[in-house]
Amino acid sequence: MRYIFIHILLSSFVFCSGFLKTQGRIIVDENDEKIIFKGFGLGGWVVLEGYMWNYPGFGSTTTMENAVEDLIGQDKKDEFFSLYRANYITEKDIKFLSQNGFNALRIPLHYKHFSPSFNEFIYDGFELLDPIINACRNNNMYVILDMHAAPGAQNTSDFSDSDGQTAKLFTEYSNQKWLTSVWRYIAEYYSNEPVVAAYDLLNEPVLPWGYGPQALRNIYEWVIDSIRTVDPNHVVIIEGNWYGNDHTGLLPPFDDEMVYSFHHYVGGSTDTATMYNQYRTGISLEYNVPLWVGEFGENSNYWGSNIKSFFER
């Protein structure tokens, strides 16, 4: 979905070399100092989003990549996207963000850059991420890895690279096994990397009609169990159903390093203060867990400024 800013509802930032962890309702560093993420989401870098390209119709990654290939051929398409991704975000940009008070990047991932087919694993995704992670290290910034496009797609929207018809992550068990294996692969690679602050396991899942919340919880449990076989260190972030905002069936926490996340945009159906005070802070207070605003913005600077101030209270 649309996003520019990320935020965590939890003090000044001092970059440390150890892993972050949860401590009650906050996230802390290796010195038990409270951390507040003030971050930027890299929409359109690895996972293409149609509205960011002003693409007419259903602008999924696959649709737009195919359109470019139809225009210039596969070899030129591959060359174009290689250059595009190499220049979309650079250390100069990260330094600029750091100098302007940001301390985190949320990076949307597409499973195909790690596993183009089930049980096939490649390094393409790591070759994209590693230079950015190193640049973040050099500029005192954290990275949150976000599975934006899961095998089969976790909703029917273009930004999950779905077919526009069915969220096949939920309807096909093979895709759930595939997602689990992809996250294990990523977690094993980054298990000793403290610049990676957390794994955001599924961006904005939407259960298909007829599927209850247990279907989403099962996937989260399988993924987390798989991650923990290779990586006991990193925080895991789970988003609720219906684009991240319905946590029915996902409480209480089922991992010691778990953070709950929601997304909020102008024009939502619920008043911000009511939503925040009655529901989302209720999760944090009742279950003593951190709460993270994974996306907010971006079509009103005035609204965005006000909501940022509200979340920082």
Per-segment meaning from a language model:
Residues F19, S174-A198, L202-R313:
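Extracellular glycoside hydrolase catalytic/binding regions
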Residues D32, I107, Y199:
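Residue-level signature of catalytic and energy-coupling elements of molecular machines
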